[in-house]
Swiss-Prot record:
Organism from which the protein derives: Saccharophagus degradans (strain 2-40 / ATCC 43961 / DSM 17024)
Subunit structure: Homodimer. The RNAP catalytic core consists of 2 alpha, 1 beta, 1 beta' and 1 omega subunit. When a sigma factor is associated with the core the holoenzyme is formed, which can initiate transcription.
Annotated spans, Alpha C-terminal domain (alpha-CTD): 248-329
Name assigned to this protein: DNA-directed RNA polymerase subunit alpha
Listed EC numbers: 2.7.7.6
Free-text domain note: The N-terminal domain is essential for RNAP assembly and basal transcription, whereas the C-terminal domain is involved in interaction with transcriptional regulators and with upstream promoter elements.
Example GO biological process: DNA-templated transcription
Length: 329
């Protein structure tokens, strides 16, 4: 009787309904009374304010010295162009900053698809209109794309370089979060005779750089990592200056075979020199889908198994691989 009273219900049913290519509805039930709002509000705040992503942070437009200029032969003024550039959905693989170029001869629309990118950079909304050229003229610009988290105004990125920055390098407030809209609601749920339970409904829309399901997984992982410190309260830990190498989660040092993947998925990973779980979580979905013979079904299997262990694809690890693995090799 005592154990039944102290035991908390955990969600048994997780239903994901795709409402579009970048929108999904996720339903979790049952939850103990009150836990719907507790978890829903925590996930909502993380998804809207703390998710990592990429955004345009600086622009140089040929012939433009400040944002209050007008460009001859271009319908939009510079401020409108900058606002449109904020909506470019870009993904960078393996780098934190890149400079891209855009050059278009008019007349006609200038879209995000006209941006020239490297092989490790993707534009997810190439149809986005940046400007409209109304005459036989050209529009050229250079875009600095950076990786960050949440929302970052220009003032928060202030550095010593600002005083010597050349005229014409226009700074943008950046919204790095890939989540465009999120709403959650809590409905009633029932398990046998209990009718006082919660059902959490998340309606999430992204900018296309990440799947809605993956966004929720990453937000849950962030929340889990932040709460983990409360599990073992030992007070303030003393610094260990003699320890040169950061501690690595032992789970990441285990071979991918421990994930008990299907033979097909395991062989595909090994063919790409992915031997440890730490190697795997640093790969992105796009990178894995480029692996020969590894399809979306195998990718879904990998993501689900990682999520069950509180992990996800696209994570970044410092000092990987650790010295212990290098020595073994």
């Amino acid at each position: 009787m005592q154990s039944a009273v102290n035991e908390f219900l955990t969600p048994r049913h997780i239903d994901v309904t795709e409402l579009g290519p970048t929108r999904a509805k996720v339903v979790l039930e049952p939850l103990e009374r009150g836990f719907g709002h507790t978890l829903g509000n925590a996930l909502r705040r993380i998804l809207l304010s703390s998710m990592p992503g990429c955004a345009v942070t600086e622009v140089e437009i040929d012939g433009v010295q400040h944002e209050y200029s007008a460009i001859e032969g271009v319908q939009e003024d510079v401020i409108e162009i900058l606002l449109n550039l904020k909506n470019v959905a870009v993904v960078m693989h393996g780098k934190d900053q890149a400079v891209l170029s855009l050059s278009k001869q008019g007349p006609g629309a200038v879209t995000a698809g006209d941006i020239q990118v490297d092989h490790d950079i993707e534009i997810k909304n190439p149809e986005l209109v940046i400007a409209n050229i109304t005459s036989d003229t050209s529009l050229s610009m250079r875009l600095t794309v950076s990786r960050g988290r949440g929302y970052q105004p220009v003032d928060a990125r202030a550095t010593d370089e600002d005083e010597t920055r050349a005229i014409g390098r226009l700074q943008l407030d950046a919204s790095f979060s890939p989540v465009r809209r999120l709403a959650y609601s809590v409905e009633s749920a029932r398990v046998e005779q209990r009718t006082d339970l919660d059902k959490l409904v998340l309606d999430l829309e992204t900018n296309g750089t990440i799947d809605p399901e993956e966004a929720i997984r990453r937000a849950a992982t962030i929340l889990q990592q932040q709460l983990a410190v409360f599990v073992d309260l030992e007070g303030e830990k003393e610094a260990e200056p003699e320890q040169k190498e950061d501690q690595i989660d032992p789970v990441l040092l285990r071979p991918v075979d421990d994930l008990e993947l299907t033979v097909r998925s395991a062989n595909c990973l090994k063919a790409e020199n992915i031997y440890y779980i730490g190697d795997l979580i640093q790969r992105t979905e796009v990178e894995l889908l480029k692996t020969p013979n590894l399809g979306k079904k195998s990718l879904t299997e990998i993501k689900d198994i990682l999520a069950s262990r509180g992990l996800s694809l696209g994570m970044r690890l410092e000092n990987w691989p650790p010295a212990s693995l290098k020595n073994n090799d």
